[in-house]
Amino acid sequence: MRFRIVTAAVTWLACGSLAIAAEPAPLSQEQLAKAIKIDSLTIPTPGELFAALEKPGKPDWAGQYRTPIPMTYRNRAQIALNLGGLIADGFIAVEAQDSQQVKNIGTDIIKLAKALGVSENVLSRGNSINEFAENSEWDALHEELEATQNEVKTSMQSHQDQDLVILVSLGGWIRGTQAVSAAVIKNFDEQSAKVLRQPAVVGFIHSKMNDISAELKSEALVKSVNDQLANMEKLVAFQTGKGPTLEEVKKLNDAVSKLMDEIQKKEDAK
């Protein structure tokens, strides 16, 4: 059986523009044609990314679940980062075809989105997520999650919260990378691990983080995350044409797991 691996950029549907020279994505021409483009950077949609890597066997997606995170964050930057991570969790639950987990994650997504003051359009999607999960409509759930994250970002932009849009995307990238690297470690082969090579994407994220307001950039959590991106870029810059070694994937997983723990820690960023 062949399966799809959730890739590290699972929720990186960035809203903004910055031209960089991106490396070719490991996708077919048809998949690339469907990708979302931001100037010269091509960002594949989650569906295309899931199809980018296939290998025998079925992953234990339920094994990539994490314990529920707090829903009582007060700091908006921390909420945005965790919202991105939750959206990635939603895609993982869909891959696991776990209706109850999808509903649980969907409820939490709406709670954090509401804390950021998003539009009623976003909040109403909670019912759709529950309905599709109840009926095991996995393709529809994929589309609904993508629509939800896009509406979250659109709503933030309309409220002049572009900086928070970046943080939502970053939170999704970190959580997605954690899940993918863990899945690769569990059943390692070099070909599958190549999906983790994405220095252009990390460089793009880092450049967008440098564009956020000085006030937000000075917050302890945001500063820590931004400082660690330089190391992340090195960890995903494997030799061209070769996949990473198991040890390299483990180092990447350790780094993103540590960062994810910092993001979801209950103490609010100051």
Identify the residue ranges that each predicted region occupies.
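N-terminal Sec/ER secretory leader and immediately downstream segment
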Residues: 23-130
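Positively charged n-region of N-terminal signal peptides that target proteins for export
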Residues: 1-5
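Bacterial N-terminal signal peptides
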Residues: 8-17
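Short, charged, amphipathic alpha-helical segments
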Residues: 103-107, 127, 167-170, 192-199, ...
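Extended amphipathic alpha-helical interaction segments
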Residues: 133-218
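Sec/Tat signal peptide C-region and signal peptidase I cleavage site
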Residues: 17-23
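Secondary-structure edge/capping motif, primarily at the C-terminal ends of alpha-helices
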Residues: 90-97, 116, 120, 155-159, ...
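A cross-kingdom marker for long, charged
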Residues: 214-270
